[in-house]
Every structure is written in structure tokens, then in C-alpha cells.
């Protein structure tokens, strides 16, 4: 089964033309096509499809991709399979946040292994009845992928556990990584079988499928793709230990929107992108964006919620009320503390038990009156660590019960057998306090469920003997290290490693006044009830639509091989400068202006040697000696340095310190801009910069005649960036009344006079030539960073003005493929030099062909 656009492409290639009239979207009956993704691994095809075939879709559709389908399967005694929705699945619950007219398709694995002979039939049934597309993973491959790479490498690492010994996650296994890639490719196959790439949205969930965005982006450059990580994202110091760290980061950056539960998780991801990929981010109007090859990858911070109506419906069940009554009688005259956790090493069950033990030791009066009910769900992974946690938990429970128990009283009730959902709900209802002491967790929705259940309903109030009009109450003790903690402002937050603090929190939760319990509950209930799973899904989809809004107007193409693949997305008018084209224009024009940046344009960024090479000097001399040319080199460097470096270029004009100083091309003295009256502000700014230099290792101050620059190129990227933001705010504050601008650049903060920029040189050149009655018919302007954008803006805005010939050729060229006001680009400084050399060679050829007796035009001076 393939997408309609893909089928159309095959038909066109074979000459089988059909009518492409719009029709209602429909699914093929059976997903049976395999091997669709084979071209993704062919590096010869790395320049993937730039634009996808027009779709015949009329209805919005979103494809939800997760490790598991929200489907339950059951095989009866006759061996026949039946399927039903898994109402507990988050992927199913998020449908409540979708628009009514949005169709939802699911792709994922089934929990049960399906025989090969049954797969076609199962696929057809799931597609027709549930709009689900199953991904079938061979058992051995699934074991390596899920229990291997996901659970032995990613899961521990994302929860801050390093494989320091073979028992702690194990050493990195390349075969498990290959299995992870293979499974992600299978998922990509399934997506491509059903997607209409121009219209459909794709939402990928969790760490199991982190490389899927690359495979999808490689096939469809404009795919509308969101990714949400449901686990923590570790700090860069932890994440950087992963051998495939860059591959995973680059894969995620092929999404349009990346979602995290908390700011901490997003901050760690951004830090990793900065430290390992050299990417910077910007926050604008509350949205965080990473610029990545012309694409803006949006970062979304959005904690997930719960499905409230489902909980309320279960609260209304008769069996729930019966179970609540049973538990009320079981724990009569006792206060119940409740813990609900998976049986794994990160949930902190043993820490909770130790705190309970200490509570009963320090407060003998609570013996017989307080019970901890610990519900331990089966672990999702398997291994030695799970067995150790289970053994430790059972041993600790046994010790506490033997020490403090008595007939009719069991201090800790451990429930390690699966409970039905209504049974768990009943425990929420009767619990005085809910305890979550995980040492690291993604979101953890247990506190949210507890809050809604404590709100109750009239029937439950009657069952447990509460006045229906009485205010509801609840208490939460939560770990600082779980995703829901920042959202629960009324909870008692604890460091679970501090047993004393957890014990004190448990005691306080038991003795706090009824009024405070009610106040905390009301605050939590208001938040949880308004930030449910529907709100979460709706907000994510809205942001995804915004993030993909400019896809159609961008020109996209793929570069890079394998997992290094990425898409360059640029304005349609932005294209690579053809050297043949510019040389041709150069030859047929007579009044030419050439404006050149230096650092990053004439010399490679980060080079140890920054002085011009002999080749560069020769090229500049050849160009500037042509009487038809006016050539200016415009730099941020000071005039003394430029004078020294280009002393042999007699006909070269210079612009120093971003155009504040200009030396005309006749070799006369430097001229100074009249925009600035004084530099008294330096006495204020320099001490501030010096303070930040002393406290930021690796930073330096560059003092110019007209500007001060604080550079943190060699400082820690995160700390340097943080210090730069603070320094900028500090400088803006102390220099409010001074005529200066404080700007950030590439790892620098610069203070300079207002109105001084490289555009001044371009403006003066155009004005002077117009006054002389010589209209320019050729302009070349080349630069590589933000400071050069002012030159680009001036010459592009002069296109139809009086300073240029009506047939003027304008070439604004930046270095590298990136967003710019320039209309052309060349890949690097080597291509810039090659282009300039081509123009210089044209001068030599023309000179050789000119009659020696011909009159040489007088060179214009500026």
C-alpha cells in the first residue's frame, strides 16, 4: 500500500496518465508493500525529492506514530484474534484534542506477536475498523531494538544512569544500534505507505523513534512533522557520553516541532545542540526556535495531562463504589499514604519505604494509625536491575511489617499483582496523601489522577460518609525530579534522596490543617482540570500547524548522507551564484562597484592566520586597478590594521570599524563619520566588560577607536551565552542615555555608536557616483554575517533608484546557505576567492587585447 502521490509519480514515470481530479481521501485496503524505503540508504540519492506530487486530499489528517498501537488484542480458545481500543493509551486519548474534521491514523506495533500468515488479514481488519497500520517487527529484531537499545542504552541514559559497569546498562553495542535503525526504517515504510505528504501531519512519539524524522524528511522534504519526547532529556554532560549523540540530535532536528514536558528537559536539549552541533537558539514572542539550515525548528514546552472524562466515568461505576466501601472498612480509623509506581530502579520505591520506616520510628504515636499502600506495577523492561529492585522492595516491606506490625495492623501493604483500573481508582479515593519519590521520571501522571479522584462525586461521597457540600481535600508529596513537579505548585516537593526530608513531608501531610488541605486541593484541581490531555494535544497541533506554515513558500533540497541528512530551506529567489553568469555581466558593464567583507569572506572563519595571502592581495590589486571599477573592502577591524595589511593596494578603498572610518580609493587620509560626537560612554562600558571578562574564563575584550567588543568564542558555550545575555542587559541599562547600540553577534557583544554600520559605505558610494553623473551598471557585494546585511539591504533597495542604471546587474552574495537579504550565495571562502579571481582574470584578458595606443579612461575616485 503506497501513498497516492507516490502512486501518481510511478504512473507518470511509466506513461500511465490519469485524471487528477480531487476525490475524497480513502485508505488502501491492505498494507502489504515492503521495501519502499530502500532508496533512503542509497547515498547516491541523497538529493531527495524537493517537492512532492500534488495531493488529492480534501480532509485534514494526522498520522500518530508510536512504539505501540492503542489497541488490545485477544485470542480466543479457537485461536481467533479480536481487537479493541486500549482506553488507557495516551495515543488514543489525545484524539479528544483534535478537530472534529481531522482524521487520525495510527502506526505502531501490536503487543502480541502476529504470525506471518495472519499479518495481511490483521492489517486489513485494523485499517478498516480502527484506522491503524501495524508495524510487524521480527521477534529477534524487536528484542534488540526494545529490550536492547531502548531499555539498555537510551532509557538508563535519559534517566541519568551511566554504564560505568556492565551491570549498569551495559557497554555500547553497535548491533543494538543497527537494530534500532532497522526498526525505525520499518516504521518509516509504514508512514510512507499512507501519507499524503503535502497535506498530512505526522506526530512521532518518544525515544523509541528518535531517528524516524530523518528517514521521513529524506523522502519528503516538506513533510509536516512533530516529535514529542515523553521521557527526561539529560544534561549535556550525561548525553555527550552516548556514542551516537550527534546522529540522534540531527535526527530530531529534522522535525518541525520538538516537544518536551518541562523547561529543564528543553534546556538540556538546547545545550546539547549548542555544545555538540554549534547551534544557537532564539526566543521570540514566547517561542523558542533553532535555526537549522534555513529551517526554524520550534521547541515546545508542554506538560501532558490526563483524560478526565475517562476517570470520571470509572468513578461512577458500581464496582468502583463497592471497592471504595471495601477499602474504607479495611482501613477504618487509619490514614492511608499511597504510592503507585512501576517496579524499576528510577521510581524510588525503596526510598519511600525507608522514609515510612523512619516516620514510624520517630513518631510512635502513628503506629497503628498510618498505613502506606504501595502499588507496584510490573516493570516495562527486564533485567537484573528489575529483579534487584523487587527483592529489595520485598525485603524492606517485610522488615518494616515485622518491626512495627501487630495483629490487625500492617504498616506497609505491598500490591505487586496487576490491578484493574477501577481498583486503583478506589485506592486514590481513600488515600489521605499520594507519594511520588521517583529519582528521575518523565512526566508521571499519578498525582493528576489522584487529584481528580479525590474530587469524587456524590455517590462516592455517600459511600465514604462525606458531606456532599463539604470542600474536597488532598495532599501531595512529590519528587523534585519528575516532570509534573513544576505544575503542582501546592505539592510538597522533596529531594527523594534525603530520607529525613521525605519523612518530614509525610508527617506534615498527615498533620496539616483541613483548611490547608482544601486550599492545596483546589489549586491543583483547577490546574489539572483545565490542562487535560485534550488541551495538550490541541496546543501541540496548533503549534505544529504554525511551525509548518511556511513550507510551501520555501525552496527545499536535501544534503548530507545517512543520518547526517538535513534539508536546506531557503527563499525561492535565493540561489547559488554562477561564476559564468557574473563574469559575463562583468564583461559587458562599464561602471562597476565591488564591496567586500574580509573576515569570513576573504579568509576562512576561525583561521589562525588572518592576514591576507599574496593571492588575495593580487586579486584585490587586479580588480581595483581597473578604471571601470571602484573596489572597497569593508571590515569591522580597526583602521590601523587595515592600513598595515593592505598598504600595497593603492587603488583599494577601505572601510574600517563597520564604516565609521573610510579611506577613499585615491589613497588620501581616512575620513571620519559625522554621526558621532564623542566616546565618553567607553568609560562606563569598559569596566562592566572587564568585570564579565574576569568572571568568564576564555572571554576577551577588543578595544577599537569607536567600539568595544566582548568576545566569548573560547569560553564555555552555555556559560558564555548566559553571561553574554546578562552583559547585554547590564550594558543597555547603564548606557540608556548614551547614543550607542548594544548588539550581539557571533559569540560576541558589541557596543558601538548608533547608526554606524557597513551600509554607510554603500550609501556613500551610491550618492557620490550619482553626484558625478555616473550611474553604476554593476554592483557586487559579498559578506558572511549579520553586519553585512546592512550593505545588502542598501544595494538591494537601490535597485530601481536614481543611483543605478535601469539595466544594472546587482549581485548581493553571502557565504553559505542561510537566511539572508542577499539573493545569491557561494558555499565557502574558497569559492569566493575563485569567483573574484575569475573577475580579475577578465581584467587581464581585456587588458592584453586592448590596443596599446588606446586612450585609457580616467579612474573615478571615491
UniProtKB/Swiss-Prot annotation:
Gene3D superfamilies: Glycogen Phosphorylase B (3.40.50.2000), HAD superfamily/HAD-like (3.40.50.1000), Trehalose-6-phosphate phosphatase related protein, domain 2 (3.30.70.1020)
Region Glycosyltransferase, annotated ranges: 60-546
Induction comment: 90-fold induction by sucrose after 24 hours and by heat stress.
Taxonomy, superkingdom: Eukaryota
Record's catalysed reaction(s): D-glucose 6-phosphate + UDP-alpha-D-glucose = alpha,alpha-trehalose 6-phosphate + UDP + H(+)
Location of Phosphothreonine modifications: 32
CDD domains associated with the record: GT20_TPS (cd03788), HAD_TPP (cd01627)
Keywords (A to Z) from UniProt: Glycosyltransferase, Phosphoprotein, Transferase
Misc remark: 2-deoxyglucose, but not phenformin, enhances the phosphorylation of TPS5.
Protein name per the record: Alpha,alpha-trehalose-phosphate synthase [UDP-forming] 5
Species name: Arabidopsis thaliana
Gene name per UniProt: TPS5
